[in-house]
Amino acid sequence: MKSLKAGEETTNFSIILEDGDPALNPANRPRLSEAIEMIIGTANGYQVPFAAIPLLEHQDIPEQNLYKCLFGRDSLLISDLLYGARPDLRLNVLCALASFQGKVIDPISEEEPGCIPHEVRESNDPVAIKLTKQGGWKFPYYGSVDATLIWMRQLHAEALLKPEILDTEVSGISLWRRSLAATEWILNRLSSPSGLIESNRANPRGIENQVWKDSGDSYMHLDGTLARGDSTASVETVGEAYDALLS
């Protein structure tokens, strides 16, 4: 563990990987084709890339399984990056996330009509059980203001290549109708006092910064103090909202 700086203190510390762990040996890294197959899982019947998965040696380490599920922004971006190798994944992710698209207002899960979820887990998932019990969450969890924006952009990219996919029905609703619901969500969020999409969590125990940089210390004021509260608008989200509306 590195030495602490002046004013810092250790609040929690645990060793996850020891020196000599197989994961630290470059020779044990899988080939790209193998790695792609490793991250593929199933969500509501669709084959999708999970945000991250542990190596075989780490299957029983809880911390290594934190992202072994369908994540809104992560799975969308991964499927786009892997389009050349697995072009089927992008539409799969779009449909899988659409099947969980928000229908009602639920402050606990932060679900809102038209919103694409941040994190989708089965009820028996150990991480879901822990976050539900200790964090006051509910799954699917919708605490993300950029997943819907990225979903719109990826749908546009897929439709440019194959316009007919807009008629694809997910749970009885076509993707183009779902894009209208997503657009309504975006316009509603843009009606904030700043005219920008802000985090504004509904669950006080939910994620504070509901964007790519979602750590609690990701945003600061000019004087260096942490930007706490729920009215932070990231510059990335401004650009993503612009792209989504153009889509």
Regions found by a protein language model. Give the residues of each.
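Acidic, mature catalytic/reactive cores of soluble proteins
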Residues: M1-S247
